[in-house]
Amino acid sequence: MSSTGFTSPFGNANPFGSSGRSESGPMHRLVEEDENDTITSPTTPHFGVKNNAAPAFWNGFGGDAPSDMPVRRQPDDFPAHYNLGRRTSVSAESLKPVTDNSDNWSPPVHPKTAEQLERLKKAISGNFLFNHLEDDQSAQVLGALVEKPVPAKGIKVITQGDAGDYFYVVEKGRFEVYVNSTGALQPGPDGMGQKVGEIAEGGSFGELALMYNAPRAATVVSAEPQCTLWALDRVTFRRILMESTFSRRRMYESFLEEVPILKTLTPYERSKIADALESQKYPAGHEIILEGDPGHSFFLLEAGEAAAFKRGNDSPVKNYKKGDFFGELALLNDAPRAASVISQTEVKVARLGKNAFQRLLGPIESILRRTRYVEAEEVDPLQVS
């Protein structure tokens, strides 16, 4: 195999040792792998450079050799007829979210200098996958990521059709994305297929294969030398993000139960809203919505305090606390925002987009209208939207 391939930490040896017994752990592994397969570990210093002396059309990073390649025997390999005639099966890691302390799993931590940590924070700051994470979960992601220099142009980082093992964030450089209509990398100079895009600094790739247990959907190749990637392994990726999604949904369901306007909804309807909400934080003094702007979102105040202001009026016309909502009238009436809402303290809001608002809050539209008009009569003529 060319030196561009990933080096397995076990080489060609039986990863369970001479006894042939697997060690217990939080995940199950596929043991019927081809002995020729080599998979990259993000803990290796860097991606290798292609050895032109060996065929490389399927030998990208994370790539698998064809299943009909001859098998090189090693003294400590499995017996020659191991599993011959037996049905093989594939089992994946168990990633069921847990609510107790019986799960001893903890994410790996790879030490980083202050400079590396700062660069990494910048690299993932704009990535949508991490926007909803709590501070402690973001810290887990930062700790688990491993720096992966890519020294040369034309190095395959992931290969279409392969199993996905790592998720990557681009800190430096550019990467080209190719898709072959056959669904996998093919032999020959045009085997990667058609170029469909590029990924630049701050971008990411490889998440789909990890999220959905699907083969890689594209081949990603370095477009210039001296690139830098950060790699997150499959289990850590799924555990942190899936646990985050599960915890976030439970938190929102509990929160929505406390919102008076939503008490008439069924638990199922509230759960659908919980799935659609996006959490955002704002510092004190931030304009969450601006008077006169078109309305695109509905907001629930999770924490902190905010106030509504009309132009020409220095005093707030309405104050908001945890559990209050605003921004609904612009969506109900398809009208511009009637007031500005400004955070008075650091706040955390749950945002619901216009389409989701109209789809999910239809059952209480009349209540939303009635409640707001009652409040407008009792408090002020503001129709905050």
Swiss-Prot record:
Binding site residues for 3',5'-cyclic AMP 1: 129-260
Tell me the segments the record calls region Disordered. Answer: 1-51, 77-111
Locate the Phosphoserine modifications and list their residues.
89
Q: Where is the composition biased (Polar residues)?
A: 1-22
Under the subunit heading, UniProt states: Tetramer, composed of 2 regulatory (R) and 2 catalytic (C) subunits. In the presence of cAMP it dissociates into 2 active monomeric C subunits and an R dimer.
**Similarity section:** Belongs to the cAMP-dependent kinase regulatory chain family.
Name used for this protein in its record: cAMP-dependent protein kinase regulatory subunit
